[in-house]
Amino acid sequence: MSVHFSSRTDQWATPRALVAALERELGPFGLDVCAEASNAVCGRWYGVAEDGLAQRWEAACCWMNPPYGRGIGRWVAKAAASVRDGDCQRVVCLLPARTDTRWWQVVRTEAALVRFLPGRVKFGEGRGSAPFPSAVVVFDRTAWPSLTPVGWRP
């Protein structure tokens, strides 16, 4: 198993403070594309049974905190395609900052904005920090400033 995928779980519940800060800046999320009832960030969400990868992401602004295992590349590709194909205006993602991976090249070439978060994110109830750095990645059809803020704090 790769060191990049050495965590005991690939499910990391979204920190509520981060969601609140992002919604203040970007507007409310209309669809959480990969959630569970216990961690969905909005009223509409796709869980395992609905398989978000098989659905159209139809909302002005979607939220994505995908499973962080080996399948993460499919989620990143789906986020980029959903914006590119016009299914949604924007997909905001919380991702591990794994800039050396193949899937990160989709982020590099198609994301409108990348914000590397300082320190380690405290997921779920915040009992412990993630064993990896994180970034907020925004795929969006609108123009954004060309400079990417680094070290943004919610």
Provide a role label for each language-model segment.
Residues 1-154:
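Class I S-adenosyl-L-methionine-dependent methyltransferase catalytic core
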